[in-house]
From Swiss-Prot:
<dbReference type="GO" id="GO:0005739">
    <property type="term" value="C:mitochondrion"/>
</dbReference>
<feature type="topological domain" description="Mitochondrial matrix">
    <location>
        <begin position="1"/>
        <end position="14"/>
    </location>
</feature>
<feature type="topological domain" description="Mitochondrial intermembrane">
    <location>
        <begin position="35"/>
        <end position="55"/>
    </location>
</feature>
<dbReference type="GO" id="GO:0006123">
    <property type="term" value="P:mitochondrial electron transport, cytochrome c to oxygen"/>
</dbReference>
<dbReference type="GO" id="GO:0045277">
    <property type="term" value="C:respiratory chain complex IV"/>
</dbReference>
<keyword id="KW-1133">Transmembrane helix</keyword>
<comment type="function">
    <text>Component of the cytochrome c oxidase, the last enzyme in the mitochondrial electron transport chain which drives oxidative phosphorylation. The respiratory chain contains 3 multisubunit complexes succinate dehydrogenase (complex II, CII), ubiquinol-cytochrome c oxidoreductase (cytochrome b-c1 complex, complex III, CIII) and cytochrome c oxidase (complex IV, CIV), that cooperate to transfer electrons derived from NADH and succinate to molecular oxygen, creating an electrochemical gradient over the inner membrane that drives transmembrane transport and the ATP synthase.</text>
</comment>
<protein>
    <recommendedName>
        <fullName>Cytochrome c oxidase subunit 9, mitochondrial</fullName>
    </recommendedName>
</protein>
<keyword id="KW-0812">Transmembrane</keyword>
<keyword id="KW-0472">Membrane</keyword>
<dbReference type="InterPro" id="IPR014368">
    <property type="entry name" value="Cyt_c_oxidase_su7a_fun"/>
</dbReference>
<feature type="propeptide" description="Removed in mature form">
    <location>
        <begin position="56"/>
        <end position="58"/>
    </location>
</feature>
<keyword id="KW-0560">Oxidoreductase</keyword>
<comment type="pathway">
    <text>Energy metabolism; oxidative phosphorylation.</text>
</comment>
<comment type="similarity">
    <text>Belongs to the fungal cytochrome c oxidase subunit 7a family.</text>
</comment>
<dbReference type="GO" id="GO:1902600">
    <property type="term" value="P:proton transmembrane transport"/>
</dbReference>
<keyword id="KW-0496">Mitochondrion</keyword>
C-alpha cells in the first residue's frame, strides 16, 4: 500500500507561522500600548499640567 506524496506542507507551514507571528505581535503591541505607554503618557501629562498650574499660581 503506497502513500501519496505530501504536498503543500511547506506552504501551509509558512502561512501558519506568519499568521501566528502577526497575531502574537499585534497582541504584544496592544499590551504595550495600552498597558504601559498610555498610562505613562497620562501620568507625564498630569505632571506637566500640575507644574504649569503651580507656575501660573506664583
Amino acid at each position: 500500500m503506497a502513500v501519496g506524496p505530501v504536498t503543500g506542507m511547506f506552504k501551509r507551514r509558512i502561512v501558519t507561522d506568519f499568521s501566528v507571528t502577526m497575531i502574537l505581535g499585534t497582541l504584544g503591541a496592544c499590551y504595550w500600548w495600552f498597558g504601559y505607554h498610555k498610562p505613562a503618557a497620562r501620568q507625564r501629562e498630569e505632571f506637566y499640567v500640575k507644574l504649569a498650574a503651580e507656575k501660573n499660581a506664583e
